[in-house]
């Protein structure tokens, strides 16, 4: 007799580990984790079986490799649930979904919808159509990168991003000063960066935006799950209280407080339903103190890297997936209103770099949830390796931190 389901997780980062942990906590199952390379976040873990496939993230390798895995696993399991943990795995999965001939039980958005939101400029067109706010934005091609800085319709400071910082092309290009997101207070600093970028062969568009006032605690993040009929079954809002600043992870969230906002939930829920969204989604946005409105930055067609904050509030996102797809028993609709703390950094870093004293009092009064430290998976080898990386973050913040409200870096 076949078992009910097998989760197949694509990736090996913190998001992948958190996803495996969620399946373990909810169903005591052992997922299969498939990746091209194993990262520290998933090292020495007992939670999953591991399959390392050379060049698995390559367009020419991925379809056949995953199909072979699916064919093998379907002999033992009724339902195969595939959860991609990066944008490029999601993109590969969506483009080749029909090739897997129904072997994947869960559904994803269509290639057409993915193409309409996989870069920030396309996403903003959807936002405009559906009544969501977004920042003043200029999009430039590689040939326009240098001259566009003298034609901006808004003043410095500015924020600059690749059209998709998680796209394969940007992840694999190299140049001095490369980051996921850039903050500039002057023209020459911007030109220094783009001239270095122009030597890398990166041919994607650049997104140049007005800086919305506010520090890390003005940011907001929302993770969602929608069923095959585009009904939002789960929404959870978070208030980041600290971001990362080192070049490799700048803009990622280091700590989050879970929140609730009924009006925002209603707007996002309507947006997802109107565009026909299916599966997991992650929104990044910022609260604009001048207008009192939320300004959308981007949507990722998967759970966010820091999505384990949802678990801190008492909700398990994988339970919504499994109960929907396998057991047809998912709750009709859940929106979080619980306040809880998730952190990926030591408390000493929060005490030093969280400037809002009211927030600091709030976070020090709450228990903390951490993705990578799980009582059910703490071998000595894992604890040493993950713990070393965890404590090394003190050095990263000391070297790279700056106050976004008062001290933009001169790069």
Protein language model annotation of sequence segments:
Residues 116-207:
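Active-site nucleotide/adenylate-binding loops and adjacent lid/helix of ATP-dependent enzymes
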Residues 207, 280-282, 331-335:
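Flexible, glycine/charged-enriched surface loops at secondary-structure junctions
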Residues 242-245, 249-253, 300-314:
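Glycine-rich phosphate/pyrophosphate-binding beta-alpha loops
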Residues 272-308:
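Conserved metal-phosphate-binding beta-hairpin within the catalytic cores
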């Amino acid at each position: 007799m076949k078992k009910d389901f097998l989760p197949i997780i694509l990736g090996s980062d913190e998001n992948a580990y958190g996803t495996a942990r969620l399946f373990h906590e909810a169903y005591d199952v052992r997922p299969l984790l498939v990746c091209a390379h194993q990262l520290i976040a998933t090292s020495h873990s007992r939670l999953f079986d591991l399959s390392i496939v050379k060049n698995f993230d390559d367009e020419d390798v991925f379809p056949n490799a995953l199909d072979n895995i699916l064919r093998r696993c379907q002999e033992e399991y009724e339902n195969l649930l595939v959860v991609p943990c990066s944008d490029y795995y999601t993109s590969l999965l969506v483009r080749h979904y029909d090739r897997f001939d129904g072997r994947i039980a869960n559904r994803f958005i269509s290639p057409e919808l993915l193409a309409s939101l996989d870069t920030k400029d396309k996403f903003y067109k959807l936002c405009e159509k559906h009544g969501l706010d977004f920042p003043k934005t200029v999009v430039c091609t590689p040939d326009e990168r240098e001259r566009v800085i003298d034609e901006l319709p808004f003043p410095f400071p500015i924020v600059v991003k690749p059209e998709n910082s998680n796209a394969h092309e940007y992840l694999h290009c190299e140049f001095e000063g490369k980051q996921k997101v850039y903050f500039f207070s002057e023209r020459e600093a911007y030109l220094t960066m783009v001239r270095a970028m122009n030597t890398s062969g990166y041919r994607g568009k650049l997104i140049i935006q007005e800086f919305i006032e506010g520090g890390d605690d003005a940011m907001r993040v929302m993770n969602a799950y929608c069923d095959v009929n585009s009904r939002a079954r789960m929404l959870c809002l978070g208030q980041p209280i600290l971001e990362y600043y080192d070049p490799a992870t700048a803009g990622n969230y280091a700590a989050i407080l879970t929140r609730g906002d009924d009006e925002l939930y209603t707007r996002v829920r309507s947006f997802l339903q109107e565009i026909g969204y299916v599966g997991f989604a992650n929104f990044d946005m910022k609260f604009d103190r001048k207008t009192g409105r939320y300004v959308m930055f981007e949507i990722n067609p998967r759970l966010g890297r820091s999505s384990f904050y949802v678990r801190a509030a008492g909700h398990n996102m994988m339970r919504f997936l499994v109960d929907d797809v396998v057991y047809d028993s998912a709750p009709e609709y859940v929106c979080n209103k619980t306040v809880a703390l998730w952190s990926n950094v030591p408390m000493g870093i929060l005490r030093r770099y969280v400037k809002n004293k009211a927030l600091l009092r709030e976070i020090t009064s709450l228990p903390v949830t951490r993705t990578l430290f799980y009582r059910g998976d703490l071998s000595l080898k894992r604890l040493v390796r993950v713990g070393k990386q965890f404590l090394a973050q003190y050095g990263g913040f000391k070297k790279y931190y700056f106050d976004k409200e008062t001290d933009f870096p001169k790069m």
